[in-house]
């Protein structure tokens, strides 16, 4: 086999994998609308029972997801169902859409939460909390959603949250440990976005950037039930010896106080929430294998 042929094969394999997980392709293959029936994966939704559709979310791929969702719905449903919404995205993903507002939640080169992100997160909370039982919320979640949708609890400032995130990252904390702490400091993470929704139905379309697709970890589990607690967060901080010199004293006090109240009331997670992972590395690797063409190179696919 010549070097040119090997190069062409490698490009074809890589391209097939990338194309398969582009947001536009994933929405096209996952969302179908026929008359008043909307199908998301294998879930059918009777839109004749839906008054309004609100679309919210965050992530680096969520702008393209929103654009493709508008296309899937079509102009008639966009108008009839009063489709509206708000998506927090990086500044370089901004584009005009028909009904869904895209909000620049951070500069393209900054992968940290910003005050602009907090503003957008509060808008999203307002939208879902103003829905009613006859409404449908569609949440579009993709990689980077955690940093793009910051909404600190009242006792903690954004700068304090940034400080503990930087400290843990520099100390070698993994994504699970980071999110364990961040979820306890947020009004939207750890399933709280879903809890805040007053809609009769919430459906999330998720592009996973985490091995194994753990719903409570992807974008810090915006619409996934969270089994963690404040003691878990305190354990992470203790593991990395986080003291007042490393993170704020008020943050440590907040975590410790909440951990001591762990048996206090915890809101029940709603039963009308459905999460669909429409894209992940398995989709990409399967398409890449198919992209090898008639040669069908031996493949060793691992997502562990």
What positions do the PLM features span?
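N-terminal loops that bind phosphate or other acidic moieties
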Residues: 1-304
């Amino acid at each position: 086999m010549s070097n040119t042929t090997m190069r062409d094969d490698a490009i074809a394999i890589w391209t097939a994998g990338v194309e398969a997980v582009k947001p536009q392709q994933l929405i096209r293959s996952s969302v179908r609308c026929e008359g008043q029936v909307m199908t998301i994966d294998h879930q059918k939704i009777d839109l004749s029972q839906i008054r309004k559709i609100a679309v919210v979310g965050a992530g680096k791929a969520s702008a393209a997801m929103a654009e493709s969702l508008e296309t899937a719905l079509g102009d008639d449903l966009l108008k009839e169902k009063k489709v509206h919404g708000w998506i927090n995205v990086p500044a370089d993903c901004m584009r005009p859409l028909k009904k869904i507002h895209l909000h620049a939640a951070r500069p393209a080169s900054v992968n940290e939460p910003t005050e602009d992100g907090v503003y957008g997160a509060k808008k999203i909370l307002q939208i879902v909390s103003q829905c009613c039982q006859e409404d449908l919320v569609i949440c579009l979640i993709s990689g980077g959603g955690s940093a793009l949708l910051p909404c600190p609890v009242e006792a903690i400032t954004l700068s304090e949250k940034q400080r503990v995130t930087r400290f843990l990252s520099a100390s070698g904390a993994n994504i699970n440990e980071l999110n364990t702490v961040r979820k306890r400091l947020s009004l939207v993470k750890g399933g709280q976005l879903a809890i805040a929704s007053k809609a009769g139905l919430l459906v999330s379309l998720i592009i996973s950037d985490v091995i194994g697709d753990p719903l409570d970890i992807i974008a810090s589990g915006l619409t996934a039930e969270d089994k963690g607690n404040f003691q878990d967060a305190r354990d992470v901080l203790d593991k990395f010896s986080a003291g007042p010199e490393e993170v704020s004293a008020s943050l440590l006090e907040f975590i410790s106080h909440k951990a001591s109240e762990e048996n206090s009331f915890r809101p029940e997670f709603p039963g009308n929430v459905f999460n669909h992972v429409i894209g992940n590395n398995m989709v990409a690797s399967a398409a890449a294998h198919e992209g090898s063409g008639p040669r069908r190179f031996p493949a060793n696919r691992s997502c562990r």
